[in-house]
Swiss-Prot record:
Record PROSITE patterns: IG_LIKE (PS50835)
Subcellular location: Cell membrane
Protein name: Thy-1 membrane glycoprotein
Lipid group attachment sites (GPI-anchor amidated cysteine): C131
SUPFAM superfamilies: Immunoglobulin (SSF48726)
Residue stretches in coiled coil: none
Classification via SMART domains: IGv
Gene3D superfamilies: Immunoglobulins (2.60.40.10)
GO-annotated biological processes: angiogenesis; cell-cell adhesion; cell-cell signaling; cytoskeleton organization; focal adhesion assembly; heterotypic cell-cell adhesion; integrin-mediated signaling pathway; negative regulation of axonogenesis
Cellular component aspect of the GO annotation: apical plasma membrane; axolemma; cell surface; dendrite; dendrite membrane; endoplasmic reticulum; external side of plasma membrane; glutamatergic synapse
Function as written in the Swiss-Prot or TrEMBL entry: May play a role in cell-cell or cell-ligand interactions during synaptogenesis and other events in the brain.
Residue positions assigned to the propeptide: 132-162
Keywords associated with the record: Cell membrane, Disulfide bond, Glycoprotein, GPI-anchor, Immunoglobulin domain, Lipoprotein, Membrane, Pyrrolidone carboxylic acid, Signal
């Protein structure tokens, strides 16, 4: 086997085993705000996952939020971040055509051999869809699991019939 292929295969296995692989990056509009959902694996036992949201516009990188790079001052007042175990949600307030470009979500596990994973999405205001109610609910699925378990319990106790 080619040594380069062996190294690439080993690195991809290590990246997945380290548990910080970005699985998807989606964008949508909530009122006039851009919402970026960066879903990722999380098999780490501590908070060693570092992240960065950035925008590349006109061949220039602008860091919006994160622990890897220094966020630009012009975005700090417009950005909010929700950080949960399997999803990081960045909201950019008052999204305009000046904010269009390629958005990136990068995750990195710190340590002796830092590994990183990223996804990108091209965002244009006239192509954005409105965020659906169901995707807002998916951010925190624990209440849905509780609801399903409660329905089963109520059905078992004959309080409701489905």
């Amino acid at each position: 086997m080619n040594p380069a292929i062996s190294v690439a295969l080993l690195l991809s296995v290590l990246q997945v085993s380290r548990g910080q692989k970005v699985t998807s990056l989606t964008a949508c509009l909530v009122n006039q705000n851009l919402r970026l959902d960066c879903r990722h694996e999380n098999n780490t036992k501590d908070n060693s996952i570092q992240h960065e949201f950035s925008l590349t516009r006109e061949k220039r990188k602008h860091v919006l939020s994160g622990t890897l790079g220094i966020p630009e001052h012009t975005y700090r007042s417009r950005v909010t971040l929700s950080n949960q175990p399997y999803i990081k949600v960045l909201t950019l307030a008052n999204f305009t055509t000046k904010d269009e470009g390629d958005y990136f979500c990068e995750l990195q596990v710190s340590g002796a051999n830092p590994m990183s994973s990223n996804k990108s999405i091209s965002v244009y205001r006239d192509k954005l869809v409105k965020c659906g109610g169901i995707s807002l609910l998916v951010q925190n699925t624990s209440w849905m699991l509780l609801l399903l378990l409660s329905l089963s319990l109520l059905q078992a106790l004959d309080f409701i019939s489905l």
